[in-house]
Every structure is written in structure tokens, then in C-alpha cells.
């Protein structure tokens, strides 16, 4: 009985490992048709009796403003070009902060956010975190940094039912993602921690201040020229 259960669990684990590897490899080249977060938001809207129409249009790397690419890195993950999916010092700092109490601080890299939004559900359980770590490792192994950022920018939530850079640019500023200015890009990046609560087009004093900080960080990183470092600066 026990041996049968172990064999079945082992077989299920093997299928999961193989399936997840194949899925990550496919999305290395094929645009994901949607994300787990989009499904979650759609289901939540049905449960709440307020169905929403999801807005999302996939745009390739070259059709997204370099200003937005750098703004997102500046605001969310300044070590993106050099790490392998995990920012250990940031994780340690977040754990120490959370142990002291107060608002919970996260330390997710852009790669971890892609893994979570694309494949997993919301939550803070250790099981989900373990799956997130697994998918993060696979993404870093099989995708380029450019691809990771491209998928992130096409999957990030930027408002109620608004997903991806193109939908966000049209919704908040009435322009295409390729034509976003540095200020607009900074405001979009500023609301990423709480895109439902905060508005990029009608920024609160806090969001405006955060956008200003992001612009300064963009300049310190070197602006769009920073993108040349992607896939050439990773540290073992």
C-alpha cells in the first residue's frame, strides 16, 4: 500500500517536473496567451458579481518604450541584470524587517514576479513559495534577461483588468507603449506595488514622489543604455 502510494507520488512529481520544463521552454519563444493572475482576477470579478473585461495586447520587445523597461528595473529590481533570479541580501533584509512587525515587505525580483503571475496563485504559503522558486530557477535557466523583462512588461497588472504595457499605456495616457515618455514610464513603474489602489494617470502625492525617485534612479542606472547590460552582467 505504502509502496504503491510512493510510486504514484513519484510518477506525479516526475510529470510535474517534465511538464513545467516543457511549458517554460515553450514560453521562451511563444507569447503566453494569458497568466494565472489574469484568470484569478476574472474569477474574483465573477464571484463579486462585478465581471470585468480584461485588456491586454502583446507587444514584442522592440515595440515597448526603453524608458518603461528601465523604469521598471529602477523601481522593482535594480540588480536584475546581474542576479540569477533571487536577490539574497534583499530577502534577508525583508525577513528581518517582517520579524520586527509592521507592514510586510516583499523582496521579489522581476523573475520571481513573472513566475508567480504567469504560473501560480496569490498567497504567502511556503508551498507556493517553493513552486515560485522552482519556476524562477527554470525561467532564469532557459530565458534571456530580455525575454524575462519582455514577458513581465506584457503581463504586469496596471489597473482593474488592465494587463501589459500596451493596455496600460492606452488606458492611462492614450498612447502606444512605444511612445511612453520618461515621466509616464516612471508613473507606471511607481504604481506596480499596488496597481489597483494607485493610479498612474492620476497620481497621489505619494505616487508622484515615488515616480520622481524612480526617474532619479533611472538616471543613475544610465538610462536606456543600461539595457545593453542585460545578459552580459550575470554573476555566478
From Swiss-Prot:
User: Could you list the residue ranges that cross the membrane?
Assistant: 12-31
Substrates-to-products reaction catalysed: [GlcNAc-(1->4)-Mur2Ac(oyl-L-Ala-gamma-D-Glu-L-Lys-D-Ala-D-Ala)](n)-di-trans,octa-cis-undecaprenyl diphosphate + beta-D-GlcNAc-(1->4)-Mur2Ac(oyl-L-Ala-gamma-D-Glu-L-Lys-D-Ala-D-Ala)-di-trans,octa-cis-undecaprenyl diphosphate = [GlcNAc-(1->4)-Mur2Ac(oyl-L-Ala-gamma-D-Glu-L-Lys-D-Ala-D-Ala)](n+1)-di-trans,octa-cis-undecaprenyl diphosphate + di-trans,octa-cis-undecaprenyl diphosphate + H(+)
Which superkingdom? Bacteria
Q: In which pathway does it act?
A: Cell wall biogenesis; peptidoglycan biosynthesis
Which GO cellular component does the record give, naming just one?
A: plasma membrane
Q: What InterPro entries does UniProt report for this protein, alphabetically?
A: Glyco_trans_51, Lysozyme-like_dom_sf, PBP_transglycosylase, Pep_trsgly
EC assignment: the record states 2.4.99.28
Q: Which GO terms describe its molecular function?
A: pentosyltransferase activity; peptidoglycan glycosyltransferase activity
Q: Which Gene3D superfamilies match?
A: Biosynthetic peptidoglycan transglycosylase-like
Sorted alphabetically, which keywords does the UniProt record give?
A: Cell inner membrane, Cell membrane, Cell shape, Cell wall biogenesis/degradation, Glycosyltransferase, Membrane, Peptidoglycan synthesis, Transferase, Transmembrane, Transmembrane helix
Its localization reads:
Cell inner membrane
- What's this chain's function? Peptidoglycan polymerase that catalyzes glycan chain elongation from lipid-linked precursors.
Protein name from the UniProt record: Biosynthetic peptidoglycan transglycosylase
Q: Which organism is it from?
A: Pseudomonas putida (strain ATCC 47054 / DSM 6125 / CFBP 8728 / NCIMB 11950 / KT2440)
Q: Which gene encodes it?
A: mtgA
Amino acid at each position: 500500500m505504502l509502496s504503491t502510494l510512493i510510486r504514484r507520488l513519484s510518477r506525479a512529481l516526475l510529470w510535474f517536473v517534465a511538464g513545467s520544463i516543457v511549458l517554460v521552454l515553450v514560453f521562451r519563444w511563444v507569447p503566453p496567451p494569458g497568466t494565472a493572475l489574469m484568470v484569478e482576477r476574472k474569477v474574483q470579478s465573477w464571484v463579486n458579481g462585478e465581471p470585468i473585461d480584461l485588456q491586454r495586447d502583446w507587444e514584442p520587445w522592440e515595440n515597448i518604450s526603453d524608458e518603461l523597461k528601465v523604469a521598471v528595473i529602477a523601481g522593482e529590481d535594480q540588480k536584475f541584470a546581474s542576479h540569477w533570479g533571487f536577490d539574497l541580501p534583499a530577502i534577508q533584509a525583508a525577513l528581518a524587517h517582517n520579524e520586527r512587525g509592521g507592514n510586510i515587505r516583499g523582496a521579489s525580483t522581476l523573475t520571481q514576479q513573472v513566475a508567480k503571475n504567469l504560473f501560480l496563485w496569490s498567497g504567502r504559503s511556503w508551498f507556493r513559495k517553493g513552486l515560485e522558486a522552482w519556476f524562477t530557477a527554470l525561467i532564469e535557466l532557459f530565458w534571456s534577461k530580455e525575454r524575462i523583462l519582455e514577458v513581465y512588461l506584457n503581463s504586469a497588472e496596471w489597473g482593474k483588468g488592465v494587463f501589459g504595457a500596451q493596455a496600460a499605456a492606452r488606458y492611462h495616457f492614450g498612447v502606444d507603449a512605444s511612445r511612453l515618455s520618461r515621466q509616464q514610464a516612471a508613473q507606471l513603474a511607481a504604481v506596480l506595488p499596488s496597481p489597483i489602489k494607485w493610479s498612474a494617470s492620476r497620481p497621489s502625492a505619494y505616487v508622484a514622489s515615488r515616480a520622481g525617485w524612480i526617474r532619479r534612479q533611472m538616471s543613475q542606472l544610465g538610462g536606456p543604455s543600461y539595457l545593453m547590460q542585460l545578459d552580459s552582467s550575470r554573476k555566478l
